């Protein structure tokens, strides 16, 4: 995006598995950013997305349609989507022609949910790399459904996927635990919330897995996976409830810090006006303890806490 000022644009690449809330996040974040005074352009990069709830500035479906690809090449949904992303990678001139008139906007890229696109397939990473050449500074926002915290085996799997995504995508990166307002619906947590957000000593998870006859046979494998995660020590999570302005603001602060966005004085005044009712003059990150008290009922003690009382 070289040429007339402003030469640098900022945005978010919203990624994550199907059902993690990417499209809902784009809707909620776009509304929040507009309330701050930012000009927002939401770009749909998922050719399988239909009936989008937000106003779409650019839609990859105008370039290539998943249904057409599946019919013409006799591919399944996953193979068809990979082909669509490779087709977009080969036709980036089309994407640049769509983005250039939106210079000066803050971009939200709603990306496909196929995990392999973010862990080992090269098309999406190549697209992001080319955007960097256009002076578009993105932060990868990786959404994970918070219900995985209630199952130790699934949480280890999520940690592995998050780590692989961080290493593969090659963008400034934050991980979100989405749908925090629904976490109680999935069962009790084995530990306090900060154990999962900060990814503390994972050996305790192994002890919980050892109580399951099925996973007891895979203890050595789980130990190696946990060791890999702890050796890199890169993964952590920010809790998110997209309906909560305070929660969205914590995420936005992390995103702006990651990609270097510096907001204007006018935006700061808009932020203070918006958040004063809920947060007063305190714009620092809330403690994880406060977040736990907000989203978990006082009677919902962790499994670990109940065991200690016996």
UniProtKB/Swiss-Prot annotation:
Q: Name one Pfam family in it.
A: ATP_bind_1
Keyword check for Zinc-finger, yes or no.
no
MF terms (GO), sorted A to Z: GTP binding; GTPase activity
- Motif, Gly-Pro-Asn (GPN)-loop: chain positions: 76-78
Site positions (Stabilizes the phosphate intermediate): 78
Positions where N-acetylalanine occurs in the chain:
2
Stored SUPFAM superfamilies: P-loop containing nucleoside triphosphate hydrolases
Q: What are the entry keywords? A: Acetylation, GTP-binding, Hydrolase, Nucleotide-binding
Q: Is Cell division among this UniProt entry's keywords?
A: no
Under the heading CDD domains, the entry gives:
GPN2 (cd17871)
Note the InterPro entries from the entry: Gpn, Gpn2, P-loop_NTPase
**How is this protein organized at the quaternary level?**
Heterodimers with GPN1 or GPN3. Binds to RNA polymerase II (RNAPII).
In Swiss-Prot or TrEMBL terms, this protein is called: GPN-loop GTPase 2
